[in-house]
């Protein structure tokens, strides 16, 4: 008996990404010990090695001529995402008494300015062009507390180690060298990009739990909607300004898991916001879960809209 698993996943918006991620989340929530038994089972929960392989594959699809375009797109999208989060946060702080339906400016800035790098790679790998995926070299900068600290006036405390930057760039450069030296190797490696998406989607899911969603409550879900929908629309427009299809912009409309630690990092610097940080942390966790669902749906929706117009988003203009 045959079960049409792939056809079912294809019918779900972002299904190849969302379903494995949700399965991983359910496993982490209800059967955490099963994932910690060791060996190859636990290895399936490690996203980093799979993402490293994906970086090499992405690099192999890029010609040296396309690299500056990817850097430009990544820079614009990163800047716009940062500016969007800061603008909304400052508006809430200045004109709404630092309270938007129970959400503080700290929570808004931390959630909206950070993005889930693994989710971005999976979605651009499935729906976007190689330039879209290559933009990750720059968009990776917003995965953490650095930009949030800048926004809150504490940039002197936060640093991004140079070695961390190199660790992102080197696998992509290795892939670029291989792909530019041998067209057959480029073609061979291109066949692997879509195959590994469900695997690191599952691994990303094992870093989330449904408890995060419950703890954040309705306000955390609203924060996720603001990040994915409002932020996503702005990012799609910004992406198109760079000559892109909008896929990279939609794929960047998430909240990074690392953002959950941002309020505590800020509170260590400025203890006066410790109370706000305690409330913001579960809200950001809920936003992470919410955007992990909404961002793939938004990206899939936009990809289908482009296809109806006769535009193939996987092909760069």
What are these regions (language model features)?
Residues 12-18, 70-83, 131-140, 188-200, ...:
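Cytoplasmic-side transmembrane-helix entry/capping segments in multi-pass membrane proteins
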Residues 19-30, 42-73, 172-182, 191-216, ...:
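Hydrophobic transmembrane alpha-helices of secondary-active transporters
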Residues 28-29, 87-94, 148-157, 203-217, ...:
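Hydrophobic alpha-helical transmembrane segments in multi-pass integral membrane proteins
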Residues 38-54, 100-114, 159-173, 218-230, ...:
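Structural signature of hydrophobic alpha-helical transmembrane segments
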Residues 42-47, 62-93, 144, 208-239, ...:
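Entry/N-cap segments of selected transmembrane alpha helices
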Residues 62-72, 95-103, 113-135, 141-144, ...:
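Juxtamembrane helix-boundary/capping and inter-helix hinge elements in multi-pass membrane proteins
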Residues 75-114, 221-271, 298-306:
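Transmembrane alpha-helices that form the ion-translocation and gating core
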Residues 80-88, 112-117, 133-154, 255-263, ...:
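Membrane-embedded alpha-helical segments of transport systems
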